[in-house]
UniProtKB/Swiss-Prot annotation:
Source organism of the structure: Thermofilum pendens (strain DSM 2475 / Hrk 5)
Protein name: CDP-archaeol synthase
Gene behind the chain: carS
Transmembrane parts of this sequence: 5-25, 43-63, 91-111, 116-136, 147-167, 175-195
Function text: Catalyzes the formation of CDP-2,3-bis-(O-geranylgeranyl)-sn-glycerol (CDP-archaeol) from 2,3-bis-(O-geranylgeranyl)-sn-glycerol 1-phosphate (DGGGP) and CTP. This reaction is the third ether-bond-formation step in the biosynthesis of archaeal membrane lipids.
E.C. code: 2.7.7.67
Lineage start: Archaea, Thermoproteota, Thermoprotei, Thermofilales, Thermofilaceae
Family recorded in the similarity comment: Belongs to the CDP-archaeol synthase family.
Domain of life: Archaea
The keyword Transcription regulation is assigned to this record: no
Length: 204
């Protein structure tokens, strides 16, 4: 898939989601969501999840230079004959993502952008959500590295928000909406940067 087409789909998502928020919650709420202060607060709050989601590919590349990686599905297949998760979801990557996300979470908790519980829940939820997304992609016969628009961008955020909501409390509605609205765009931009730097094989 061409990156320009991918970006167009995400732009369309932004417009449609914004319209839905406008219709349901009103113009004033949408304006408050997109205020720079709220955007900055939202990105800082979700940063542990972002870091946890982005780190596994880096850790896996570092580890596989000297050691063998261990896939989390142990090479097992589902009833459809396809792998449960695939070789790209490894214990090393999961551990690296968790450690990185928690470290960032602790720093943000020290600065009082998140609480101590969120410093753990957000990275763990993001990684579990990413595994759930990988499971769905394998069922759809989408190979590792191939794009699945919106699923790739929102699976880890959904996992982080769900785990946070189950075991702690979610932030203000404006923060949650900003995270869901802006994450696909942030995800694409950071992945493009990682691709340019040689950290990823594909720009999505």
């Amino acid at each position: 898939m061409r990156i320009s087409v991918y970006a167009c789909f995400l732009g369309l998502y932004f417009l449609v989601f914004s319209l839905i928020v406008y219709v349901i919650l009103g113009a004033e709420f949408l304006v408050s969501v997109l205020q720079p202060g709220n955007v900055a607060r939202s990105m800082l709050w979700v940063l542990p999840a972002y870091v946890a989601n982005a780190s596994p590919v880096v850790f896996s590349r570092l580890v596989r230079k000297r050691w063998r990686l261990h896939p989390m599905d142990f090479g097992l297949t589902f009833v459809d004959g396809q792998r449960l998760l695939g070789d790209n979801k490894t214990f090393e990557g999961f551990l690296g993502g968790m450690l990185s996300g928690v470290l960032v979470g602790i720093l943000l908790a020290y600065a009082r952008f998140v609480d101590g519980v969120s410093a753990f829940l957000l990275p763990l939820g993001a990684l579990l959500g990413d595994l759930g997304g990988a499971f769905v992609k394998r069922r759809l016969r989408i190979k590792p590295g191939e794009p699945a628009i919106l699923l790739d961008q929102l699976d880890f955020v959904a996992g982080a928000l769900i785990l946070q909501g189950l075991f702690s409390k979610l932030p203000a509605a404006e923060v949650v909406v900003a995270v869901v609205l802006l994450t696909p765009i942030v995800h694409l931009l950071t992945n493009m940067a990682a691709f340019v730097l040689g950290l990823k094989d594909v720009p999505w």
